[in-house]
Curated annotation (Swiss-Prot):
Transmembrane segments: none annotated. The gene is xylB. Pfam families: adh_short_C2 (PF13561). It comes from Caulobacter vibrioides (strain ATCC 19089 / CIP 103742 / CB 15) (Caulobacter crescentus). This is D-xylose 1-dehydrogenase. CDD domains: SDR_c.
Amino acid sequence: MSSAIYPSLKGKRVVITGGGSGIGAGLTAGFARQGAEVIFLDIADEDSRALEAELAGSPIPPVYKRCDLMNLEAIKAVFAEIGDVDVLVNNAGNDDRHKLADVTGAYWDERINVNLRHMLFCTQAVAPGMKKRGGGAVINFGSISWHLGLEDLVLYETAKAGIEGMTRALARELGPDDIRVTCVVPGNVKTKRQEKWYTPEGEAQIVAAQCLKGRIVPENVAALVLFLASDDASLCTGHEYWIDAGWR
């Protein structure tokens, strides 16, 4: 698909968490096409190295850095190494299925840490540098799941609901420094991982539930994120922006 070019993104320093596969890979590729300097964080070495090689011909080739976002010291270390940035995309997460009866205290901590906690601490790490650079954009990833009340995802949905609240609070706190904080809420996005799950019948059910009949792919999500990161969205902050084809 073709996409808009945002001159304001050229040369911007962008960090994308979970940028090595799925929606994240689409984000990494999208910012690279804009001429941004992209650093993407992940723990999936094989996928991330493959993406790095695939995008090596970009105006500024993206750089992969391995970082376990569940480790707060690792977050501090990687951002100290990266330095100041203009854009942070908090994309990383994991929607492991579970039943209420199976949830333990340790599993609660793990799910909240992998889906919510790192977003706060990554934002904390970049905010001083963004202030010094005269502003910036933080884009968090929510989920349609808790708006729909999907089953077997209570901790994932709890974390994703929290992200929307955190977005609003951070937008208020960081706004005086011209740091914008927004939240993207994707619908059902067709990634390589999801292609392994869904039968043709399942695909048809997803499309039937949408107002629009197109299937959402990572490039569609990236198009929204690129806009929110650009100067064209200079007065967009504190709210959720949906890309769900009307599935709600």
